[in-house]
């Protein structure tokens, strides 16, 4: 079998102007970035706003193994399979962060014969959105430090600035830094730090904004610091939201590319799901819904993180809720949740599949709490045995959830036809009646308790000393009406990554709350979740290269 990049480079690309005709987009509606990438114009986005939205399919997963469960690959393969069975389909995915591409992942545009193309461009600089977001974010940092230097008219306490700088790389050495050193002309010395760009509130705002006006309003509402009297300071107090929106005026436009099979795909925005809300842009998803009969989108990591945030944070900003949710599972992950060591996952173990099924079962039950039909997709691997597959199918039948094998990595669209038909049938047979997990009027404590007990299966939520004080403070500022965004390990329902399966006798401890008032949610930090990742001992970058003719090598 060829590598992902070898497969991607072997596929003859069609001009993007030809690809998008399938969903009623003309060449004049595009802002081209070469022949195979484009941004969609605001004029086209506005012109389809009155269209009735099509069906929305959300792809999520069980709690993943370190290698991931193939959610993006499955999303692409499902979209291609829907196209193959005659459905007018679009795909709406997140764009990769360069940090993990250079770090552990090596690439994030699908895999095998289920990829979005041009894969190398998407994984690297693409259309420059990440750079624009990084620039806007750091421009705000520079403007804050300049305000301190120029007299600090707003009375900002330099010790209480909560706006860090960002970089789209994994660089642990920048987590905590001191700025303003050297001499009085170099600024006011203070502690600072760097997050990865995909953890930036600017990224979250770009992905939740519905247009430029909304983008500017959300940027204005960012909390950047506290004064000496502990009152919050907003971007609007600095009067720079217009400048930030100007930097982002092109980045907010959704990017269009194609799959190997020729399905039109929006790839736009990329917040992480363990430290942010983990969904692609509202603009991309909403526009796809109004252009296609079926839109396939995904939410990061497992359903306890990405799907929960999609349904509680993103869905209220969309024209409709998902009509079906596909939960991707692998037998290797189920066996790991059933207690099998990583080194032994290739050996048949039906008992471990039965034990690990508790993890999948809880995810199915959780999605059903939102009143949305569920389909399970088994992402097939060559090490899967007939006995293991049969056990999993029997277990799914016991909880009355449709389940289909999918081999889109190896077979592309052909490997996802059974899954596509199952999803279409689920939508036709059972109408979604979306119900949110909590109400806006619920307190932050009530919202967090609902997520911990209803979604994670935990016993209770505990608050550290800092978080306890913040609960009172945020209520005084009126921020308790916002939804919550949990920053938690993706490997477990709990905040302990080693607690696999479906644990229940555990508490989740919230150590700190972070206001993201521009994005419109409050981040709750648990465990040791880092907002600036580090590189592994052997980074994927060590295998990457470029030939003399400019061909990328080693992007998996």
UniProtKB/Swiss-Prot annotation:
Pfam families: FTHFS. It catalyses: (6S)-5,6,7,8-tetrahydrofolate + formate + ATP = (6R)-10-formyltetrahydrofolate + ADP + phosphate. Its EC number is 6.3.4.3. The keyword ATP-binding applies. It is an enzyme of class 6 (ligase). GO terms for biological process: tetrahydrofolate interconversion. Pathway: One-carbon metabolism; tetrahydrofolate interconversion. One of its GO terms (molecular function) is formate-tetrahydrofolate ligase activity. Keywords: ATP-binding, Ligase, Nucleotide-binding, One-carbon metabolism. InterPro entries: Formate_THF_ligase, Formate_THF_ligase_CS, P-loop_NTPase. Belongs to the formate--tetrahydrofolate ligase family. This is Formate--tetrahydrofolate ligase. It comes from Streptococcus equi subsp. zooepidemicus (strain H70).
